[in-house]
Amino acid sequence: MQLKAFSVSEVTEYIKKVMDNDIILRNVRVRGEISNLKYHSTAVYFTLKDEGAALKCVMFNDYSRSLEFTLQDGMSVIATGRITVYEKGGLYQLYVQSVQMDGIGALYIAFNKLKEKLQKEGLFDLDKKKPIPKHPRKIAVVTSPTGAVIRDIITISRRRNPTVDIMVVPVLVQGSSAADEISNALRILNKRKDIDVIIVARGGGSLEEIWPFNEEKVARSIFASRIPVVSAVGHETDFTIADFVADLRAPTPSAAAELVVPDIKVYQRELFLLKTKIMNLMKAQVLHSKKEFEGLKRALYLNNPIKKNEVLKQRVKNLKKSLTKEMLSIFNQKKNELLVLNEKLDSLSPLKVLTRGYTIVLNKEGQVITSSRKVKTSEEVGILFSDGRATAVVKEVKEDGERI
C-alpha cells in the first residue's frame, strides 16, 4: 500500500496543530542561556541554549515592555510561553510571554562580569572622580517622582538649606525601560549649565528590582557626565555598578541629601566666625593706625619750623645765660688772681724799697748799676728816688772794704 504524499504545508500545519494542542507546549517554562539577542521594531529575537540543544525564541514588544530588566547575551533566564511552528520558516520556536532571571546566582555572575570589565577600563579609578561642590545652588534628582525617596530628599534638603533648588527629574527606576530613561536623563541634564550636582536615587529592593543600576549603559552615562554624580541606590548594604562609577556613593537617598546639601547652620556659624575675624582685624588695624598717627603727629610737632625756632631760641637764651655766668665766674676768678699777683708784685717791686730811703743808680742807658765795677770815675749816672730822680758824676770808685 502506497502512503499518501503530503505537501510541506500540510505536514507543517499538522505538526503545528499537534504542538498547539499539546497541554505542556501551550504553557511551558524553558531554562537556558540567552544568545544571538537582537532587537527589532516589533519584537525581540534570541536563542535559548544549553549544553545539548538550542531553541529559537521571539518576544513581542507588548510583553518585553513589562520586563523588570534588560535582556543580555550570556544571561541565564527562565522563559515562559508557548511553543509552536513558524510555518513559513518551517521552524518551531518559543513565543515568550515573560522572562525571569534564573536565580540570584546568574545576576551575580552578570554583575561581576560587568564590574570586572568596567574596572579594567578605568571607570572606577579614584583619580577620575569629580569633586562634589561644597556650595551647590541647584541639585537634580533623577528618581521616581513618587514615593518615599524623593520626599525624604526634599524634606532633608529644605531642612538643611532651603536656599538650594531641588529639581526632580522623573524616571522609571525598575523595569526594562528604566536603564534607558536614566541614561537619557543624565544626557539631557549635561546639556544644561545651571546644574551643580546630580543625585541618582531609588529605594531598596531585590537585586532584580535595582538591576537597572547595574546596566552598562547607566554606568557609562554616569562616567561620561561632566556634572558630578552621586549614587544613592537601595539600602546601606546594597552596592550597584552605578555606585562604583559615580563620583560619590551615598548609603541611602537620605544620606545623599545630607552629603550634598550643605547645612545652612554651618554657613551661619562660618559667617559669624568670619565676621568676628574681620572685626578683630579692623580693630587691630585701627589701633595700629592710631599709634602711627600719634607718632606722626608727635614727629610733625617736633619737626615744626616754628616749634624748632622756639626750641632754638630757648637753647640760645640758655647758652647765653650759661656763657654770661661762666664768663663772669672766670672774670672774677682772674680778677682775684690778678689782685693776688699784684700784691705779690708790689711787694717785690724795687720802687717799694725806695720808699724806705733806698735809691737806685742807673747808667746812661737807664740800666741798673748793681756793682761798683760797672761804674767809672767821671761817669755820669742817674739816681732814682721814690719821689724822683737826679743826675750825678762819679768822682771816685772803691771796691768793697774800701772807704769812700
Curated annotation (Swiss-Prot):
InterPro entries: Exonuc_VII_L, Exonuc_VII_lsu_C, OB-fold_nuc-bd_dom. Keywords: Cytoplasm, Exonuclease, Hydrolase, Nuclease. CDD domains: ExoVII_LU_OBF. GO terms for cellular component: cytoplasm; exodeoxyribonuclease VII complex. Its main location: cytoplasm. One of its GO terms (molecular function) is nucleic acid binding. Its EC number is 3.1.11.6. It is found in: Cytoplasm. It catalyses: Exonucleolytic cleavage in either 5'- to 3'- or 3'- to 5'-direction to yield nucleoside 5'-phosphates. The keyword Nuclease applies. GO terms for biological process: DNA catabolic process. The keyword Cytoplasm applies. It is an enzyme of class 3 (hydrolase). Belongs to the XseA family. Bidirectionally degrades single-stranded DNA into large acid-insoluble oligonucleotides, which are then degraded further into small acid-soluble oligonucleotides. Heterooligomer composed of large and small subunits. NCBIfam families: xseA. This is Exodeoxyribonuclease 7 large subunit.
